[in-house]
UniProtKB/Swiss-Prot annotation:
InterPro entries: FabA_FabZ, FabZ, HotDog_dom_sf. CDD domains: FabZ (cd01288). It comes from Coxiella burnetii (strain RSA 493 / Nine Mile phase I). GO terms for molecular function: (3R)-hydroxyacyl-[acyl-carrier-protein] dehydratase activity. Keywords: Cytoplasm, Lipid A biosynthesis, Lipid biosynthesis, Lipid metabolism, Lyase. This is 3-hydroxyacyl-[acyl-carrier-protein] dehydratase FabZ. The keyword Ligase does not apply. One of its GO terms (biological process) is fatty acid biosynthetic process.
Length: 145
């Protein structure tokens, strides 16, 4: 499957509003990579306090968006069924860098690539862009909880 809409996404990861931070998956290569979209709207609950004068998406939520994309890639790579109960947790975040702010109206393109899988620990390279401009990059590690 190369495309997943929000209904499909909810069948494979446990996140729900206000912490479901992926709107669509546009490309999946099992065991390799995934590309997803997050449409950032002014109605996001975090904009109320971050920041009222100039709304900016918190960097930790950009990282979380990448982690959710990685979670979908894991589930699809392992051929887990819809409604599975497995949950993958952060094991680490390395080399996180933020290069541009993400504001209401932006569309985040989230790309994750598998770097390594060892003993159930998955390591990914993640990149979030807006209009082909790098917003965030990081290495993410996850493990089944």
């Amino acid at each position: 499957m190369n495309v997943m809409n929000i209904t499909d996404i909810k069948k494979y990861i446990p996140h729900r509003y206000p912490f479901l931070l992926i709107d669509r998956v546009i490309k999946i290569e099992k065991d390799k990579s995934l590309v997803a979209i997050k449409n950032v709207t002014v109605n996001e609950p975090f904009f109320t306090g971050h920041f009222p004068v100039r709304p900016v998406m918190p960097g930790v939520l950009i990282i979380e968006s990448l982690a959710q994309a990685a979670g979908i890639l894991i589930v699809k790579s392992l051929n887990l069924p819809e409604g599975h109960k497995d949950i993958y947790f952060f094991a680490g975040v390395d080399n996180a860098r933020f290069k541009r702010v993400v504001e209401p109206g932006d569309q985040l393109t989230l790309e994750v690539k598998v770097l390594k899988v060892h003993r159930g620990l998955w390591k990914f390279e993640g990149k979030a862009t807006v209009d082909d401009q790098l917003a965030c990059k990081a290495e993410l590690m996850t493990i089944k909880g």
